[in-house]
Amino acid sequence: NNKDIALIDVTGKQPIVNLTESGYTDVNPRWALDGKAMIWSSDRAGYRSHGSWGAERDYYLMFFDLDAYERFHMNKEELALADTTKAADKKDAPTKDKKAKSKKNAKDKKTDEAPATKPLVLDLDNRFDRIVRLTAHSARMGDAVLTPKGDKLFYQATFEGGNDLWEQDLRERKTRLLTKQSGGGEMFLNKAGDNIYMVSN
């Protein structure tokens, strides 16, 4: 019996969507890139458990946003150019009428309500065309976390009897062993993405 990953509308107004539909086991999903993508592990490419002897997995990234997908595939020079262009466009954008802005600010000060969060619009129709394999090698995987910028993946993998902590630099296409025998457990990144916290028994 394979496991899939589902997207559930908490309001109950939309049907449940099977995001993976791979026919293999897809587990351990996490939101990534401010909700514009998700990472998860799957045994679709590794050593498969057809005979119930266990399986090897990889981590994948599925995009629900075209801009995020295209940005992920940019190199350093392209990213720098895109950021410069975006900053210039923002600077040159026409400003709103000062009086209208002043009235809005005065109105905002009268209420303690938090500003409404703009809901994400997920492009689910094209999700299967925007899947990226993140890990360079299949293995018996533990948990994994993707940095906020989407440039590095930290993951646990077992090769020689215990979980090791690895880093996959997705910009430089380099894999690096960080710590041997790090132990298994759930991992979390801080907001800046420069510290990993592991909950391990």
Predicted regions and their residues:
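Blade-edge beta-strand/turn elements of extracellular beta-propeller
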Residues: 8-21, 127-134, 173-178
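Residue-level marker for the onset of beta-strands and adjacent loop->beta junctions
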Residues: 4, 130, 140-142, 164
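Conserved beta-propeller blade repeats
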Residues: 1-2, 21-41, 47-48, 138-156, ...
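A short helix->beta-strand "capping" segment at the edge of beta-propeller domains
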Residues: 118-140
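A flexible loop/linker signature enriched in serine peptidases of the S9 family
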Residues: 1-6, 12-13, 20-27, 34, ...
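Short, acidic, Ser/Thr-enriched surface-loop or helix-capping motifs
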Residues: 10-11, 32, 147, 170
